[in-house]
Design a protein with these regions (language model features):
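Structural signature of the two symmetry-related core transmembrane helices
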Residues: 78-93, 184
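Intracellular juxtamembrane helix-capping segments at the cytosolic ends
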Residues: 126-140
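C-terminal ends and interior cores of transmembrane alpha-helices
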Residues: 86-106
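A membrane-interface helix-boundary motif in multi-pass transporters
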Residues: 169-187
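Intrinsic disorder in cytosolic terminal tails and internal cytosolic loops
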Residues: 197-239
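Helix-loop boundary and gating motifs at the non-cytosolic
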Residues: 17, 28-42, 48-49
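Loop-to-transmembrane helix entry/capping segments in MFS-fold secondary transporters
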Residues: 46, 140-152
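Helix-to-loop junctions at the C-terminal end of transmembrane segments
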Residues: 63-75, 171-172
C-alpha cells in the first residue's frame, strides 16, 4: 500500500534531499532557459547554439547510467559531493573557453574546449536529481517512495520558479559569464551542504533503494517510471 508523506516528514527523513532539490531546481531551470541566451550573447551561430543544447542533453542522459552504477556501490552523498564540485570546476573552465577569453594558440576560438567542458559539466550535473531521489529513498520505507518522489519534485519546482530570474541577475551584475558564476555557486552550495550532512549523519543501506534515472519534471508523473515503486491502486468506480 502506498503511504502519504508530508513535506515536514520528508525533510526530517532527508534534509539533504529537500534542500538539494530546491537548489537543483534553481540550477536546472536556469541552465535550460538561459544557456541559449548566453550562447547568443557570446556570438555563437544558430548552429552552434543548437549544438550546445543538443550536447548538453545527450551527455547528461548518457551519464545517468555510470553515475547510477557508482552511486549504488558507494555512499550516495559522496557521489553527490564529487558530482557537484566536479560540475563547478568544469563550469569554471567553461568561462575561459566561451569566446571572450581564448585559450593559448587559438584553441578557444574553435570553441572545441567550450564544448568539451560543457559536456563534462553536463555529465556531472544532470544526473543530480536522480541521485537526490535515490539518496532520499535510502532513509525511507518502500511504501513511501512515491510520496517522497512527489515531495522532492515539488521542492524542485519551487527552486525552478526562481532559477532564471536569479541567474539573469548574475548576468546583469557580472556580465555574460555570470551565467556560469551562478551555476558554480549553486552547485557548491549543494556540495557544501552534503559535506555537512555527512558529518552529522551516518550512511544507511536500504535494500529497497536503488538509483533510477528519472526525468526532472515538476510533476509526480516521473515516479511512474520507477520500477521499484508499486502501482497506485485506482479507486473503484461508482456505478
Amino acid at each position: 500500500k502506498i503511504k502519504s508523506m508530508s513535506l515536514k516528514e520528508l525533510y526530517s527523513s532527508s534534509p539533504l534531499g529537500m534542500v538539494s532539490s530546491v537548489l537543483y531546481g534553481t540550477i536546472q531551470s536556469a541552465l535550460f532557459t538561459l544557456l541559449a541566451v548566453y550562447a547568443a550573447a557570446m556570438n555563437f551561430s544558430i548552429f552552434d547554439i543548437s549544438l550546445v543544447t543538443f550536447m548538453l542533453g545527450i551527455s547528461g542522459a548518457i551519464s545517468q547510467y555510470p553515475v547510477g552504477y557508482i552511486s549504488d556501490k558507494f555512499d550516495r552523498r559522496k557521489v553527490i559531493i564529487y558530482s557537484t564540485f566536479g560540475a563547478a570546476i568544469f563550469a569554471f573552465f567553461a568561462i575561459f573557453s566561451g569566446g571572450t577569453m581564448y585559450l593559448p594558440e587559438g584553441l578557444g576560438s574553435s570553441k572545441f574546449w567550450f564544448y568539451f567542458f560543457l559536456v563534462a559539466f553536463s555529465m556531472c550535473s544532470l544526473p543530480m536529481f536522480s541521485l537526490i531521489l535515490a539518496h532520499t529513498n535510502d532513509f525511507i520505507t518502500r511504501d513511501k517512495f512515491v510520496a517522497a518522489g512527489a515531495g522532492l519534485q515539488f521542492a524542485f519546482g519551487l527552486g525552478a520558479i526562481s532559477g532564471p530570474f536569479l541567474c539573469s541577475l548574475f548576468m546583469d551584475l557580472v556580465g555574460n559569464n555570470g551565467f556560469f558564476v551562478f551555476l558554480i555557486i549553486f552547485h557548491c552550495l549543494i556540495g557544501v551542504f552534503a559535506v555537512y550532512r555527512m558529518k552529522i549523519r551516518p550512511s544507511e543501506e536500504n535494500p529497497d533503494s536503488q538509483f533510477v534515472a528519472v526525468p526532472t519534471t515538476i510533476t509526480p508523473v516521473g515516479m511512474e517510471l520507477n520500477p521499484t515503486t508499486e502501482p497506485i491502486e485506482e479507486p473503484e468506480k461508482i456505478k
